[in-house]
Each structure stands twice: as structure tokens, then as C-alpha cells.
Amino acid sequence: MKPSMAILLVIALIIFSLDKSYSANDKPIGKCGDAKRNKPCLACSHRSSIADFYSKCCTYDAVYNGCLDKLRH
């Protein structure tokens, strides 16, 4: 095997292992790392026609509180 091929193989293995370790530790965005907030935001995002509702619910307290009101009624 040529040295350049060996170097490329090692680089590919390093990138693959780093990608796996980072993707395994993905957490929900914003404040939705907390399961208490994540579940209502998911439920409201499925009911909403707004494309980025989940991210807004996780980020903004006013949207989250509105979501809770919708789920209560």
C-alpha cells in the first residue's frame, strides 16, 4: 500500500470515529434538554403548521407557555 493511501485511510477512520462520537451525544436544542419542556414542545410542533415551531418553543418562554395553554384546552 502506498504511504499516501495509508494516510488517507487513517484520516478517514479518525473522521468516522469523531462523527460517531459527536452524533451519539446530540441533545435537543435550547432549553429542550429538559424532558419536562421537550415533551410539550414536541406535541405542539406536531399540531402546528409553523415549520420551526419546535425550535421556537425550546428557545422562547412565551412560545412555550402558549404551547402549554394549547395543550390544556
UniProtKB/Swiss-Prot annotation:
Modified how: Contains 3 disulfide bonds.
Signal peptide as annotated in the record: 1-23
Gene3D superfamilies xref list: 1.10.60.50
GO MF entry, a single one: potassium channel regulator activity
Positions of disulphide bridges: C32-C58, C41-C57, C44-C67
Compartments where found: Secreted
Function text: Inhibits voltage-gated potassium channels.
Protein name, per record: Kappa-scoloptoxin(03)-Ssm1b
Provenance organism: Scolopendra mutilans
Lineage: Eukaryota, Metazoa, Ecdysozoa, Arthropoda, Myriapoda
